[in-house]
A protein has these predicted regions:
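S-adenosyl-L-methionine-dependent methyltransferase catalytic core, i.e., the SAM/SAH-binding region
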Residues: 1-171
Length: 171
């Protein structure tokens, strides 16, 4: 969608679909240095989220995967079934700002093994008091797992550092 919207600027704009952490490598390979500006689409693609096989949605019986790229090895199922209660709690709190992270982590460990997204969602929905009726009580847990699995914050941090290196003066 973004690419189509920016088509009229193709002389001044290059559309690249890649992980943020590759920005410097791509700029050097494409020989458009120095860059005068960089635009990042930080939103999550609904095309990826809607793929049932990835387990991003808590509304479907889908494997607990949550990887954006199948080249990654760690899945949500791995995290939920092998990490300690403390590690899971930390992930939920740090990446999802989940206030009930300890209780959810305890429930996860007590209900192992987990294989499907709807299983995890049901455990949370049936045991966690809902404080915000506008969002599903599983939302923050799924967000936290997705961010952790895909190293989204690490990628963004690397990207920002590299962006400063490839931006020209006044960029």
């Amino acid at each position: 969608v973004s690419k189509n919207r920016l088509e009229k600027y193709r002389e001044r704009f290059r559309y690249i679909n890649s992980n943020f952490k590759n920005v410097k490598k791509i700029a050097m390979k494409s020989k458009f240095l120095p860059c005068h500006g960089i635009i990042f689409d930080l939103g999550v693609s609904s095309l990826q989220l809607d793929k049932e096989s990835r387990g991003f949605s808590f509304r479907r019986k889908a494997p607990l995967d949550m990887r954006f790229s199948i080249n990654q090895t760690l899945t949500a199922k791995d995290v939920l079934n092998t990490f300690s209660e403390s590690e899971i709690s930390d992930i939920l709190y740090q990446y999802g700002e989940e206030r009930q992270s300890r209780k959810i982590a305890k429930l996860i460990v007590e209900n192992r093994p987990l294989s499907y997204a709807d299983e995890l969602s049901d455990i949370i929905k049936n045991n966690i008091r809902q404080t915000n009726y506008k969002i599903n009580p599983s939302t923050k847990t799924f967000q936290a797992l997705r961010i952790y699995i895909n190293e989204e914050l690490n990628s963004l941090s690397q990207d920002l550092e590299q962006s400063l290196e490839i931006l020209g003066p006044g960029g």
